[in-house]
Design a protein with these regions (language model features):
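Positively charged n-region of N-terminal signal peptides that target proteins for export
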Residues: 1-8
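Bacterial N-terminal signal peptides
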Residues: 8-19
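Signal peptide processing junction and immediate N-terminal pro/mature segment
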Residues: 21-23
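A short, solvent-exposed beta-edge/loop patch
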Residues: 25-26, 32, 95-159
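Functionally engaged cysteine thiol sites
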Residues: 31, 36, 57-59, 121
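Sec/Tat-exported extracytoplasmic proteins
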Residues: 35, 43-47, 63, 155-159
Length: 159
């Protein structure tokens, strides 16, 4: 009887592990979402190959004072990426501006610090159950919005 319980528990654990792996495999690796030529075309500069920032679901490219980051949102603190998106879209913080963005994904918004571009300009995109952010640095705000939107449209095609 004890061995049947151990076998059953092992099977359940195996199936649970497999489901975690398959759902993790559904999330693109950050550096595979955008290519060096796509980044270079959008920014107008030659950029380094993409490198993960802190996790495989993030990536950064840079060159000539321009930086592009891509971050694919993951579940966090019991909230799905879509829940995080909806919360961030509604949240107001002093000095931080969010603006709706159209024409990319199912829903999107820009996020930036008012009156400066030191912290870059992000475009947070929801497509289906996926959420990602393209953030650009080294551009004035109008340029940053154009560059981030160009790259976000290309990234959205991978989700």
């Amino acid at each position: 009887m004890r061995s049947i319980g151990l076998i059953s528990a092992s099977i359940v654990l195996f199936l649970f592990s497999f489901s975690l792996l398959s759902s993790a495999a559904d999330v693109p690796v950050g550096c595979s979402v955008l290519t060096q030529p796509q980044i270079a075309a959008a920014t107008g500069v030659t950029v380094s190959p993409g490198a993960p920032i802190s996790a495989p679901t993030s990536c950064q490219w840079s060159g000539s004072g321009k930086i592009v980051t891509l971050t694919i949102r993951q579940p966090l603190a019991g909230k799905s990426p879509v829940d995080q998106f909806n919360d961030a879209k509604k949240k107001t913080l002093p000095g931080i501006t969010t603006e709706p963005a159209s024409g990319v994904g199912d829903d999107a918004f820009y996020i930036f610090y008012a009156g400066q571009n030191r912290a870059g300009c992000g475009l947070v995109v929801k497509k289906g159950t996926s959420v990602f952010e393209v953030r650009v640095y080294g551009f004035d705000l109008a340029q940053a919005k154009t560059v981030s939107k160009t790259l976000a449209k290309e990234a959205a095609a991978k989700f």
